[in-house]
């Protein structure tokens, strides 16, 4: 199966961004463009379609021309809620999720995740030191379990991913590609890089 033809890319831009003082992290600029755009631009050559999952400033995201998927669950309940909203509102079987604060994802992210899926409904990035469960290739088949998990009040991404039979894919050879931007200081450091 050639997954790259049927995978929808999703930029997760719905976090509370507490460490950014509540600012909409996806709209913060790095090198003259919003963080979410860096991720969308990196995903676009790898996938036929890219959408944005967001829960505020929808008009700004919609001005990009990309389809914007609002959360179907109120009160910012986390990335799993954004994922469920995408399953509910976008056709297709496979979705590649990536948070808006990972501006340097590798050009072969989709191919590597798909190649190491080995039949699992969920695979995510491991950078050699830590898991990145929100950078994940996920099949719609997990939607019923995800719905039940969220209805039970659960929010922990890693636990859910393991419960549905997922596993990590090793990206230790490009660990630096998964450094994210969480604080104003980190954003300033990114701005200073060569």
Swiss-Prot record:
It catalyses: Mo-molybdopterin + GTP + H(+) = Mo-molybdopterin guanine dinucleotide + diphosphate. One of its GO terms (molecular function) is metal ion binding. It is found in: Cytoplasm. Pfam families: NTP_transf_3. It comes from the Bacteria. CDD domains: MobA. GO terms for biological process: bis(molybdopterin guanine dinucleotide)molybdenum biosynthetic process. The keyword Flavoprotein does not apply. Its cofactor is Mg(2+). PANTHER family: MOLYBDENUM COFACTOR GUANYLYLTRANSFERASE. Monomer. Belongs to the MobA family. Transfers a GMP moiety from GTP to Mo-molybdopterin (Mo-MPT) cofactor (Moco or molybdenum cofactor) to form Mo-molybdopterin guanine dinucleotide (Mo-MGD) cofactor. This is Molybdenum cofactor guanylyltransferase. It comes from Salmonella typhi. The gene is mobA.
